[in-house]
Amino acid sequence: MSGLNIYFILQICSHTDTYFFIYSLSITLFFFSKYKMGVCISHEYSKPNAEQAEILQDFSKFMKPEERPPMAVEHQMYDYRLVEEEQDDELFAIVCCPHSIGYERDKIALVDLDPTSETFCTILSEVHLTSNGDEPGRMNWAKSAESLGEMNKFVRRNIIVPCMNSGKIYVIAFENEKLWIEKEIRNDELIRKDVSCPYAVRSLPLKGAPVHVSTLGDRFGNGKGDFILIDRRTWEVRKKSEPTFSDYGGDFSLQPRHNLMISSEWGHPRLLRDGFMPSELENVSESFGARLHVWQISPPKLIQSINLDTCDGSLVICVKFLHNADCNHAFAISAIGSSIFHLHMNTLTKEWAADRVAHVPLLKVENWQSDEMPALLTDMIISMDDRWLYVCGFLHGVLWRFDIQDPFRVSLHGKINLGGIFDSFPEVRIKTSNAMEDRWWLPPETRSLPRGTKFRGGPALMQLSKDGCRLYVCNSFYKAWDAQFYPELISDGGQMIRVDIVDDEMQLNEKFLIDMKGQPNGPFVIRDIKFLDGDCTSDSFL
């Protein structure tokens, strides 16, 4: 209890007037509640009402000056309008295109996003990887911008492509609309460091800082959450100096200003490659991870592990810090459990917590693989102004938009249907019992077709423009999952579509479609999108 609270208690004890006692007690409780927490207090307690304000004014003379205890920085959003004129709309994107069957090499392609161009929605150039079946994960640029204003002021020349199946890591060079392989890091280099299955890439905006790559397994393919570091000048691989690792690896996010990193847990790589088995889903605690890990970036050190409920938090597929480097808030989503978590730190105790702020319920269905269908959340994106959170449900075929201006009180703002099981398999129907539940979570009945073409599969991975007006969506996440739920993705290839945010609502752009069906040596699927001049996922601001 602070000195201020003790002071008011002494005031209470020194007065016998009942009326004064009641008012003094009210003040004591009010200030004790306001100062007992260390995280974003304004989001946990409402402003005083008129009566409380009057009490504060009447008894302000009794208030003893005291320093405010250390608080977490309030959630503040970027005002994108301040730098909007300095930013360019995305004209090109680099996309990852694995071969859907695997008898041809995967490729990385440059696509045209400029609606005024004659080559709009076509592949301008491409580079094939060196072997079949590499299965690229989440690629990223080797260089990060320090801030939003710096995005257009430096050249992005190299993109790092980790491959989950082959264990290779490719360094792809880009210049003058040409792509080529600058460096191939072979699997045996990772095996010697007792890691395998590289998945996600993040870069620091510091000069000379290495590229971080998360790995999902050990040398034998068992679950092991670790990281390797890649020198940006020589492309040499080294292991992090701290020997601690988690049970499982997964996605991760960097916050360099606070020297923090948060990583998630997936599961055993060998299980992920086989898709979802009923036996694994019945006992998720033995097959998948349900923890988030908070690390110190440099020198590397595990700070805290956060245990999530296994029903809600198993297989946390994605985790991201807010863009505003002053804030130490983050969000995460789980594939199994289809939940959204808000991560925040109490700056008095330095303890991190993960609150479940939203949950997409199971749908009761008939004529499907199971009687209940999860949403299977596969990706999320936070807008550059830290106001909106986009989450896609791979099976339900829905993209949700959440308002996160108050990260403690996340609210669902809108949704749009993009394919899904119900589009791919008309015989699958939602049982009428779902009508009694919250209809906000049911897939929308209205559907649109990009260029009159069916959107195969469901929304899997996304990218958002810096101004938050154009959301690009592709329909492949991992080929084992694609084949299990949407066989037509394997036979016909993947697609990339665009959702426009107009008047605060999401609308499918019916003129935009990149379809890999009919590609030479195909079919290919599309996943992971990176804009040349920066986007909402590539950079870790300082």
Curated annotation (Swiss-Prot):
InterPro entries assigned: Se-bd
Keyword presence, Metal-binding: no
Keyword set includes Acyltransferase: no
GO terms assigned for molecular function: selenium binding
Keywords for this protein: Selenium
Top-level division of the source organism's lineage: Eukaryota
UniProt family annotation: Belongs to the selenium-binding protein family.
Protein name: Putative selenium-binding protein
Organism: Caenorhabditis elegans
